[in-house]
Amino acid sequence: MKMKETQKEIYQNKLDKGFNVTDVNKEFCLLYGEVAEAYDAWRKKRETVGEELADIAIYLMGLSEILGIDLESEIEKKVAVNRDRVYQLVDGVLRKTTDDPTPCQR
């Protein structure tokens, strides 16, 4: 199944179940909570890490659909950007060699 179809299916399920589809702030908070749950499961070496990561993907795709964002297209564009970036290791920190001064910790 293509990601766009999955986004639509997730959004439709939210509508069908009466879940939030209008409060973007709430969706970001719920997504944050799912990330925390996944981290906790990983930290405690639980077998539910995969399920928690799936929850993150579901919330992310639902939020993308609410915002009218084609997540698959955005991911493809970002992967291309990341692939073409050049970094330089400076004092143990990877830095982009472009004008962006934001360091990326290794």
Residues covered by each model-derived region:
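Flexible "arm" and connector segments at domain edges
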Residues: 1-106
